């Protein structure tokens, strides 16, 4: 998910000042923290500007960047079986240096700037590189925690030591921890809140393809993103 794909849709959702609320339906195991922040900030700012409340409804999962985005809302609802949380930062990769040695291949790197080859997967792991990455992760994690604490406030159970460790919970457990506000689905909650005659207008992202080059480029990007997304969903057993 990124701001370019959803920027116009978000603006359209807030255009009608007569709207009683904007419902944000999320099914995401995470992604870029930067894009999650961009999207969340966009929603929060428009909500304040238009004075329209936002309600998040979680489907299968709202984890990591998905939960960051969920917290852009004033309220969060989920199913009892939804997966919620994973408030943490992760970096993953592979080390291929031993494989290269086995097949007799030399790795040659030429850089201007001593840190340009930081964390190169074809070179032996460097303790200073790992330390640098860990420091960066800690700063990102602290920023993530600050945002969640700001948005959820006194609702969350800060006494729970696992809250910000990257742990994830079922919807029912998340409710008890204050990570969400209730159990329920979008249609039933909105009808209870605004009456049986409530009208729901959906805004969905649809990519357009203009030429073969663009089609091929976007197709490969979509396939790559789908594979990565599927692997992350597998982490949560979905």
Question: Which residues fall in each region the model found?
Answer:
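N-terminal organellar transit peptides
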Residues: 1-79, 90-238
């Amino acid at each position: 998910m990124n701001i370019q794909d959803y920027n116009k849709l978000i603006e359209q959702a807030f255009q009608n000042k007569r709207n009683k609320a904007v419902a944000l339906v999320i099914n995401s195991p995470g992604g870029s923290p930067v894009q999650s922040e961009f999207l969340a900030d966009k929603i929060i700012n428009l909500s304040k500007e238009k004075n329209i409340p936002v309600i998040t409804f979680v489907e299968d999962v709202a984890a990591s960047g998905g939960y960051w985005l969920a917290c852009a809302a004033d309220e969060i609802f989920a199913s009892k079986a939804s997966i919620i949380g994973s408030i943490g930062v992760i970096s993953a990769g592979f080390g291929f240096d031993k494989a290269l040695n086995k097949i007799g291949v030399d790795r040659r790197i030429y850089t201007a700037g001593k840190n340009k080859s930081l964390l190169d997967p074809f070179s032996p792991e460097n303790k200073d590189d790992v330390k640098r990455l860990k420091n960066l992760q800690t700063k990102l994690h602290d920023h993530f925690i600050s945002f969640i604490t700001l948005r959820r406030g006194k609702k969350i159970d800060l006494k729970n030591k696992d809250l910000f460790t990257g742990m994830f919970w079922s919807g029912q457990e998340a409710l008890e921890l204050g990570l969400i506000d209730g159990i329920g689905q979008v249609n039933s909650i909105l009808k209870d809140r605004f009456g049986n005659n409530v009208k729901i207008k959906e805004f969905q992202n649809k990519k357009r393809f203009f030429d073969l080059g663009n089609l091929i480029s976007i197709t490969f990007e979509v396939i790559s993103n789908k594979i990565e997304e599927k692997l992350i969903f597998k982490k949560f057993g979905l």
